[in-house]
Amino acid sequence: MNVNSVIYYILFLFASTILAADKTSSSVSPTLVWVTGTDANGKLATTQSTYYQSFMSTYTTAETPSSGSIGLGSISGTVGEIRTYSMTTISQGNGGLSKFNQNGLEMKNLSFVKLIGVSFIAFISFILLI
């Protein structure tokens, strides 16, 4: 095997992975996470584990509150009163995706970008074979 064949094979595997990622539509999503703990000898160890996050089905019907209530259960208070909190948590929703979605782009539909990426890989592979 020459060097060009090896490079072509690696690029082919990379392109296949990109195309395969576009076809999945599962509700279970594996994520690699790093977990730190102690091993059997009591020493600190960090290992990589696969975390699976699954989502339960949602229901189309919802409970309707009885007449005269607003459906908040045991929450009570005065309307219009300013509330104070002893702790405030500020976080950015969706990790880094909020800026991406504000620009009118959707993370779910990147088929065109993947097509461009695969085309680029095919072009480079063709150049290497010449």
Swiss-Prot record:
It is found in: Cell membrane; Secreted, Cell wall. Pfam families: KRE1. It is a lipid-anchor; GPI-anchor. InterPro entries: Kre1. Keywords: Cell membrane, Cell wall, Cell wall biogenesis/degradation, Glycoprotein, GPI-anchor, Lipoprotein, Membrane, Secreted, Signal. The keyword Secreted applies. Belongs to the KRE1 family. GO terms for cellular component: extracellular region; plasma membrane; side of membrane. Involved in cell wall 1,6-beta-glucan assembly possibly by the addition of linear side chains of 1,6-linked Glc units to a highly branched 1,6- and 1,3-linked glucan backbone. One of its GO terms (biological process) is fungal-type cell wall organization. Residues 1-20 form the signal peptide. Glycans are attached at N109. It comes from the Eukaryota. This is Protein KRE1. The gene is KRE1.
